[in-house]
Each structure stands twice: as structure tokens, then as C-alpha cells.
Swiss-Prot record:
It comes from the Bacteria. One of its GO terms (biological process) is regulation of translation. GO terms for molecular function: rRNA binding; structural constituent of ribosome; tRNA binding. The keyword Repressor applies. Pfam families: Ribosomal_L1. It comes from Nostoc sp. (strain PCC 7120 / SAG 25.82 / UTEX 2576). Keywords: Repressor, Ribonucleoprotein, Ribosomal protein, RNA-binding, rRNA-binding, Translation regulation, tRNA-binding. Part of the 50S ribosomal subunit. Binds directly to 23S rRNA. The L1 stalk is quite mobile in the ribosome, and is involved in E site tRNA release. One of its GO terms (cellular component) is large ribosomal subunit. Belongs to the universal ribosomal protein uL1 family. This is Large ribosomal subunit protein uL1. Gene3D superfamilies: 3.30.190.20, 3.40.50.790.
Length: 238
């Protein structure tokens, strides 16, 4: 069945030409098409030339967005002993040991990011079926399994994001709020591009970036010229 497109979205789509836009032009258009009645996120949707069913073609990493996410991030920490106190002092919103694991098993999910120290991971592993589908399962690659809980808390609250390519090789990631200036969005988008290039899977062959779109949460997709973004010097946006 064909999905009905709203009149609002049709009008916004009419503003977007079928071509690749330069980075700043694309982000200016993203802001222009963010007309929903709530604070929309700025999103990137990137199809990469990888097949994640092969282990050497998987992408899972983190990016530190210099201008932040524009969101308040609630961080939970599962640890033991002095690390519980360290996490509390570092500003974690939820902290606990085995009792927090039990609460999560019973359905507690009032956090956006879960950090665990390596010594509790055998117990945290039993939460996989609950946390995995929500993208909350701690992992070393995601920077969420660490004894340095204070640094991890600070980084995620400041704008560090974990992302991965899905089973079709597409990365969906939020890189700020549509209310940010185009220049601030560009700083974050450049950080994302550099992170994806730096973490290119060893098994990736041929053209790495296949298609690259940005959009507001409820807005139309806007195609971005990846080569122009790669070549962009951030001083040009100043």
C-alpha cells in the first residue's frame, strides 16, 4: 500500500531540488524545512559501500560532536565499590550495582546511555535481550565499558554519540538540533564525516560513501556532496 504523503511534506519537498547540495547550502535548507511544532533533530542518513554480514565490513564507533547534541543526556552507571562513588561525583543520573541490574530487569529504563565497568559485565550480559534492541547495551567499541567512568560520563553528556551501520550498510545518526546555526551543524557534520572515514572497515571495497542525505526529523531528505564536505575547511564557515 502506498504511504500517503502529507500536504506539508509535499510543500517542503518542492523546495528541495534533485541534486547534490554543498554542505552549508544543505544545512540552510534543512533549517528552512524544519517546520514541525516541536524541536526537530538534524539527522544524517548515509549509505556506505559495505556488507555488515561480514565482520570486516562492520562499522560501530563513537563521534564527539563539538557543538553538542542539543539534548539532555541521562547517564546510568553500573559499577562496584569506589567506582559507584566516582560515578555519582561525576554527575551520573542513575548509579548502582547488582540492585540496578535487578531494577533494569524489572523494566527500569529512565536513562539514555548505560555505562558499565568491565568487572560487572558478566552480570550485565543477562540484560542483553532488554538493552540490545534499545541500543543501550554497554560495549567496549562504544566507549561504554570502562573503568574511567568519570571521563565517559563527561564525554556522553557533552555530546559524544555511539552509532553503527545497520544490516543494510546505512548509518542513521542525529548530529544536532535543527535550531542550531548552519555553521554549528556543519562543525558537527564534519566531525561525523571524519569519524566515518577514519573508521572505514578493512573489508570495504570500491566507493565507500554511496549516498549521503541530511534532513530535519519531519523534513524532506536533502542530498549532500560528500566530496565538498571532505574538502571543506571549517574556517570557511566562520
Amino acid at each position: 500500500m502506498t504511504k500517503k504523503v502529507s500536504r506539508r511534506l509535499r510543500e517542503l519537498q518542492a523546495k528541495v531540488e534533485d541534486r547534490e547540495y554543498g554542505p552549508l547550502d544543505a544545512l540552510g535548507l534543512l533549517k528552512e524545512t524544519a517546520t514541525a511544532k516541536f524541536g526537530e533533530a538534524a539527522e544524517a542518513h548515509i549509505r556506505l559501500g559495505i556488507d555488515p554480514k561480514y565482520t570486516d565490513q562492520q562499522l560501530r564507533t563513537t563521534v564527539a560532536l563539538p557543538k553538542g547534541t542539543g539534548q539532555i543526556v541521562r547517564v546510568a552507571v553500573i559499577a562496584r565499590g569506589e567506582k559507584v562513588t566516582e560515578a555519582s561525583n561525576a554527575g551520573a543520573d542513575v548509579v548502582g550495582s547488582e540492585e540496578l541490574i535487578d531494577e533494569i530487569q524489572k523494566g527500569r529504563m529512565d536513562f539514555d546511555k548505560l555505562i558499565a565497568t568491565p568487572d560487572v559485565m558478566p552480570q550485565v550480559a543477562k540484560l542483553g535481550k532488554m538493552l540490545g534492541p534499545r541500543g543501550l547495551m554497554p560495549s567496549p567499541k562504544g566507549g561504554t565499558v570502562t573503568f574511567d567512568v568519570a571521563s565517559a560520563i563527561a564525554e556522553f553528556k557533552a555530546g559524544k554519540l555511539e552509532f553503527r551501520a545497520d544490516r543494510t550498510g546505512i548509518v542513521h545518526v542525529m548530529f544536532g538540533k535543527a535550531s542550531f546555526s548552519p555553521e554549528d551543524l556543519l562543525v558537527n557534520l564534519k566531525a561525523l564525516q571524519e569519524t566515518i572515514d577514519r573508521n572505514r572497515p578493512s573489508g570495504a571495497k570500491g566507493r565507500y560513501w554511496r549516498t549521503f542525505y541530511v534532513s530535519a526529523t519531519m523534513g524532506p531528505s536533502i542530498r549532500v556532496d560528500i566530496n565538498a564536505l571532505r574538502d571543506y575547511k571549517l574556517t570557511e564557515a566562520a
